[in-house]
UniProtKB/Swiss-Prot annotation:
GO terms for molecular function: structural constituent of ribosome. GO terms for biological process: translation. This is Large ribosomal subunit protein uL30. It comes from Shewanella pealeana (strain ATCC 700345 / ANG-SQ1). Pfam families: Ribosomal_L30. The keyword Signal does not apply. The gene is rpmD.
Amino acid sequence: MATKTLKVTQTKSSIGRLPKHRATLTGLGLRRINHTVEVEDTPSVRGMINKVYYMVSVEEV
């Protein structure tokens, strides 16, 4: 069975944000505004997305 993936796009800047939130964006593989990555839909990734929900947009692929 194929694993689900999520398309995560950074929509806001990380400048002036908490260091943990910046590190979370890096952990997701995001580098700049409008950068999009595809990640596996796992509980740990969902937790990271929930932590920085105000800076990213998510689509199911």
